């Protein structure tokens, strides 16, 4: 029985398509829906650029407040995209969304950790990020989640591949 689901989004080009699947499944199963987006940690190059322009106090302030602001903005963007997608008649669907979480870390690990923490019954994600080429059979995050997920995974195929008929 599917009572709760975790929709993992990269906020990319195909996110609205995957979101439609997540909402339809939540509706079909009358299930709670959790949403997660992973923000990759800042790379060494970006960190060194910041260090060259900011003193230690400003850098610490950026890490504590700047990251929180970015995360809050992303969470709001996800909420807004759901509202946009649903229009005025989607209040009931919006109520299915229990939480939107933006967490820093490796995307596959964030998804797997949240699946375990929330005890969801199903994971929903796209087969590729928007940057992956259509010739790649499966994106890195999707492949890792499929290998290690403790629950079934609903994988939405890349729209461009479906249109061209490549399988």
Predicted ranges, named:
Residues 1-64:
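Small/aliphatic-rich secondary-structure junction motif
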Residues 57-73, 94:
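Short glycine/proline- and acidic residue-enriched helix-loop micro-motifs
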């Amino acid at each position: 029985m599917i009572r709760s689901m975790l929709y993992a989004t990269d906020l990319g080009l195909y996110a609205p398509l995957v979101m439609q699947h997540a909402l339809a499944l939540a509706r079909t199963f009358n299930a709670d829906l959790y949403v997660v987006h992973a923000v990759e940690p800042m790379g060494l190059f970006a960190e060194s650029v910041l260090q060259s322009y900011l003193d230690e106090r400003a850098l610490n302030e950026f890490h504590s407040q700047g990251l929180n602001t970015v995360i809050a903005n992303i969470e709001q963007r996800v909420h807004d995209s759901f509202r946009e997608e649903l229009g005025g008649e989607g209040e009931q669907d919006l109520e299915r969304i229990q939480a939107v979480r933006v967490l820093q870390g490796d995307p596959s690990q964030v998804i797997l950790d949240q699946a375990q923490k929330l005890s969801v019954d199903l994971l929903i994600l796209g087969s590729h990020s928007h940057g992956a080429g259509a010739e790649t059979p499966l994106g890195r995050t999707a492949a890792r989640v499929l290998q290690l997920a403790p629950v079934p995974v609903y994988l939405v195929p890349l729209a461009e591949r479906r249109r061209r008929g490549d399988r």
